[in-house]
């Protein structure tokens, strides 16, 4: 829950000097990306901008305090300020901020700018007291903000020092409007206006000018002079002399003498106690100070000119001027040290009564009251956890003694979930085991169930499905239906275990159940996770269209619940890319993989390994080995600098092995095979993948017998588990094995079976990557004219893709082929009497394969003009005039030689 006063622009006070000269300068603020107002405390920055903001409706105001160094809190308030300015225009960004569904502040701002692009009018965002920000993460995010904000948005920053926002670049590009302390200092005329408003008896202009000069136009000093004059008519010159040359850091003594010592004791106590509140209203004041009518007291303090300012139009919220508030808090530490814990406790109770647990925790920590902190956490910790207030929770739990956690085991559970969210899996089990061992009395079944549900999640994350299954089932047996979150966790783990064990039908059913439970209780990340799992299961079963439709549901969920920046979004994009790749929609597959990498841009580079493997895979399917090698270099560097789950390693190894096959790199393949552990089983599609990698290398090395044993066993397991997509892949590897071993009839048999199964899976690229050997076999099958119609269309599509993408297509026109062609009894007489050179045959092969002139020049490493000469010569020899005629001529020659094209 956001504190309204932090989003309220300060109310324009009576008796303030209107700074016409500065307002005139600010009138052109919409022409700049940044308006920067900097000066030491007390120069009137906030007052000036509140005057300028008066009457502007499309303006958001965000007043900072020290707690805003938490990036999540900063994001929530900043987006709320934008929403205030736009009347709720940026709904997606607001939901993402509220639910902490973004990878970083920069990525959240990127989403914000997408929404603001449709905003039609100038817009302003004021951030006050930016000097309180010390977190470099926020500084970096705001630099991103300034680089990418839309042109119609102006950021207005108020700070006591020069902020780390990269302003030099903005200054050079004339996108920065600056107002500093010299400009903020009062002029003689403004000082006279100020005294005329504040003093009952006017002072002479010369005297006013001298006072202004004595304090160098410092507004706070002028206010203190006026305050002293009201309290003691003879104090004007004395105050001016004391304040001359003084700065904000040496004001304490002056404020004690001239302010605190000149008010009655009740007012002094009120000031000191109320200053502990970063913002205050009637109820807070009444509870903290004991005043019966807090609102009336605040208005009285305001009338006395004691540096109190209204924070909203309703006049409900107040705060002290930062300079004065800081001074009062310091004095409170000295003068009321024994009462401080009680004051903070009262503040915490009042904040709790108004529904602000985060502020209450701040005061409970300051009071050192572990019991109060414990009670707040017991009532509100899970709400804070679900809103990702993780830093605050961690700080709070550390402040509680271990005995207090033991006495309230749900706080132990909370601490364990915090560790789980930070991937500190081993610490989770250690913490829970220690708690169970040291806890006094029996744990009830519900708590046991919650502990076991969390342990089950840790076990599956840590690659221990057997232990995960045991714990999940025990949890489900003991957890009541009301403990929906832990039941969702345990059910999800159960479904994932079934998936790992190859029981896809049951796993699909359990994951559908998980989705329903998660949707019912708005646990959206588990709903998304269950949809991703369902899609993977359907893919493994060979139902790729159903997998596609499930992915569509997941993308809709992401859009509706604004989950775009969760890492799970990358997972969904990745499995969509895998499906698109299988269907030979390579450009779309690559786009999904790159979007996935963008989602993970703010995480460790190792997280991008799987998407990077997909980029390699797309390049391999296109036959672009140079690009594949470039991506592989980065992939292998990541592999060597991280620890990965076996599934990730298997996917990375797959593209490496295919690359070695395409390039004939037997040495690299053999080295990999020597050091790669062989999985103990092949009872799911993850393990099947790594065994296929091993078999592919064995085939490349000519070790056909062990490769055949592997593939036969894989198929046996896959058939028993109905892993139809794996059967399709295994058949293609068997085809390669039989073809290379000279077992042509076996090769044809399994190829036809693979083509038939592809009617269900839709596979294209899995055939294409096998290259020329696959092309030769498909030509022969098409020439036999025995394929059913659907398989025939698929074979033609695969052959077309091989011809389009793979760079060894012109091998049809190598020297041996040309010799056989010239000796063929049906060779056209024109070719026999006017034969093409070997280079011209190569060019014809590349024209037939769909290469442009520039691509042919690149392939043969000659100039484009040379290629044009070759083409002109071969056209003349073939008696053709156009490129398409040459393609048809080449096709006829290939058909004559027995190639079905």
Curated annotation (Swiss-Prot):
GO process terms (BP): positive regulation of carbohydrate metabolic process; positive regulation of DNA-templated transcription
Keyword DNA-binding: yes
Domain HTH luxR-type: 829-894
Gene Ontology molecular function: ATP binding; DNA binding; DNA-binding transcription factor activity
Family annotation (Pfam families): GerE, TPR_MalT
Keywords, in A-Z order: Activator, ATP-binding, Carbohydrate metabolism, DNA-binding, Nucleotide-binding, Transcription, Transcription regulation
Superkingdom of source: Bacteria
InterPro entries according to UniProt: P-loop_NTPase, Sig_transdc_resp-reg_C-effctor, TPR-like_helical_dom_sf, TPR_MalT, Tscrpt_reg_HTH_MalT, Tscrpt_reg_LuxR_C, WH-like_DNA-bd_sf
4Fe-4S recorded as keyword: no
Signal peptide segment: none
DNA-binding residue intervals: 853-872
Binding site for ATP: 39-46
Activity regulation field: Activated by ATP and maltotriose, which are both required for DNA binding.
Subunit structure: Monomer in solution. Oligomerizes to an active state in the presence of the positive effectors ATP and maltotriose.
Similarity comment: Belongs to the MalT family.
PANTHER family with a match to the protein in the record: DNA-BINDING TRANSCRIPTIONAL ACTIVATOR DEVR_DOSR (PTHR44688:SF16)
HAMAP family cross-referenced by the UniProt entry: HTH_type_MalT (MF_01247)
Described function: Positively regulates the transcription of the maltose regulon whose gene products are responsible for uptake and catabolism of malto-oligosaccharides. Specifically binds to the promoter region of its target genes, recognizing a short DNA motif called the MalT box.
Protein name: HTH-type transcriptional regulator MalT
């Amino acid at each position: 829950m956001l504190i309204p006063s932090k989003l309220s622009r300060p109310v324009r006070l009576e008796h303030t000097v209107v700074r016409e000269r500065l307002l005139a300068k600010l009138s052109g603020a919409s022409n700049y990306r940044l308006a920067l107002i900097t000066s030491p405390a007390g120069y009137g920055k906030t007052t000036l901008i509140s005057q300028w903001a008066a009457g502007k409706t499309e303006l958001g105001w965000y007043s900072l305090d020290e707690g805003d160094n938490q990036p999540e809190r900063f994001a929530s308030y900043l987006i709320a300020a934008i929403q205030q300015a736009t009347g709720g225009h940026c709904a997606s960004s607001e939901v993402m901020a509220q639910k902490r569904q973004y990878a970083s502040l920069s990525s959240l701002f990127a989403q914000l700018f997408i929404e603001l692009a449709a905003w039609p009018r100038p817009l302003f965002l004021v951030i006050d007291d930016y000097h309180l920000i010390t977190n470099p993460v926020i500084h970096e995010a705001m630099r991103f903000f300034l680089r990418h904000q839309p042109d119609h948005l102006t950021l207005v920053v108020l700070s006591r020092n020069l902020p780390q926002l990269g302003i030099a670049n903005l200054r050079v590009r004339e996108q920065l409007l600056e107002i500093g302390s010299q400009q903020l200092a009062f002029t003689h005329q403004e000082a006279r206006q100020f005294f005329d408003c504040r003093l009952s008896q006017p002072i002479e202009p010369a005297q006013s000018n001298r006072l202004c000069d004595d304090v160098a136009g410092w507004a706070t000093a002028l206010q203190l002079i006026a305050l002293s004059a009201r309290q003691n008519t003879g104090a004007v010159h004395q105050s001016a002399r004391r304040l001359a040359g003084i700065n904000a850091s040496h004001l304490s003594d002056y404020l004690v003498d001239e302010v605190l010592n000149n008010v009655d004791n009740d007012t002094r106590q009120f000031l000191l106690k109320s200053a502990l509140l970063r913002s205050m209203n009637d109820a807070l004041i009444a509870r903290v100070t004991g005043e019966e009518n807090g609102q009336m007291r605040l208005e009285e303090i305001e009338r006395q000119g004691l540096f109190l300012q209204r924070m909203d139009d309703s006049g409900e919220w107040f705060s002290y001027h930062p300079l004065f508030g800081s001074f009062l808090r310091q004095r409170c530490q000295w003068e009321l040290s024994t009462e401080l814990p009680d004051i903070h406790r009262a503040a915490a109770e009042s904040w709790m009564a108004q529904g602000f647990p985060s502020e209450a925790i701040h005061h409970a920590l300051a009071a050192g009251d572990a019991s109060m902190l414990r009670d707040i956490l017991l009532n509100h910790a899970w709400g804070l956890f679900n809103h990702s207030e993780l830093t605050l929770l961690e700080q709070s739990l550390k402040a509680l003694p271990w005995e207090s956690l033991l006495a309230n085991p749900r706080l132990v559970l909370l601490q364990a979930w915090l560790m789980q969210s930070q991937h500190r899996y081993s610490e989770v089990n250690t913490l829970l085991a220690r708690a169970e061992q040291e806890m006094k009395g029996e744990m009830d079944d519900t708590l046991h169930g919650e502990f076991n549900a969390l342990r089950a999640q840790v076990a599956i994350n840590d690659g221990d499905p057997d232990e995960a299954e045991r714990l999940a089932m025990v949890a489900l047996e003991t957890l009541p239906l009301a403990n929906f979150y832990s039941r969702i966790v345990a059910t999800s783990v159960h479904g994932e275990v079934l998936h790992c064990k190859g029981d896809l039908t049951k796993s699909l059913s359990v994951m559908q159940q998980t989705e329903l439970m998660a949707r019912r209780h708005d646990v959206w990340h588990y709903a998304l996770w269950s949809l991703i799992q369902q899609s993977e299961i359907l893919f493994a079963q060979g139902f790729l269209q159903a997998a596609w439709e499930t992915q569509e549901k997941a993308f809709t969920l992401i859009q509706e619940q604004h989950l775009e920046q969760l890492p799970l979004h990358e997972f969904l994009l990745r499995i969509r890319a895998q499906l698109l790749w299988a269907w030979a929609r390579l450009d779309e597959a690559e786009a999904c993989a790159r979007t996935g990498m963008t989602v993970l841009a703010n995480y460790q580079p190792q997280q991008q390994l799987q998407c990077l493997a997909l980029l390699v895979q797309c390049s391999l399917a296109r036959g672009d080995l140079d690009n594949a090698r470039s991506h592989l270099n980065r992939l292998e560097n990541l592999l060597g600098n991280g620890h990965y789950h076996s599934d990730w390693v298997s996917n990375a190894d797959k593209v490496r092995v295919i690359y070695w096959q395409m390039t004939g790199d037997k040495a690299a393949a053999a080295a990999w095979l020597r050091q790669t552990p062989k999985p103990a089983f092949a009872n799911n599609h993850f393990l099947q993948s790594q065994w296929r990698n091993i078999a592919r290398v064995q085939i490349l090395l000519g070790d056909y017998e062990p490769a055949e044993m592997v593939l036969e066993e894989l198929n046996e397991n896959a058939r028993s588990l109905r892993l139809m997509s794996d059967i399709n892949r295994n058949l293609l590897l068997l085809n390669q094995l039989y073809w290379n071993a000279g077992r042509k009839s076996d090769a044809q048999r399994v190829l036809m079976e693979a083509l038939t199964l592809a009617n269900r899976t839709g596979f294209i690229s899995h055939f294409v990557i096998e290259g020329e050997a696959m092309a030769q076999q498909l030509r022969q099958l098409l020439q036999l004219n025995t394929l059913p119609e659907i398989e025939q269309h698929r074979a033609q599509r695969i052959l077309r893709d091989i011809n389009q993408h793979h760079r060894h297509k012109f091998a049809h026109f190598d020297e041996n082929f040309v010799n056989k062609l010239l000796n063929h009894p049906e060779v056209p007489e024109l070719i026999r009497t006017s034969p093409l050179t070997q280079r011209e045959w190569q060019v014809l092969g590349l024209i037939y394969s769909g290469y442009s002139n520039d691509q042919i020049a690149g392939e043969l490493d000659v100039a484009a003009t040379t290629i044009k000469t070759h083409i002109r010569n071969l056209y003349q020899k073939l008696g053709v005039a156009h490129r398409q005629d040459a393609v048809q001529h080449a096709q006829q020659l290939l058909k004559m030689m027995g190639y079905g094209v």
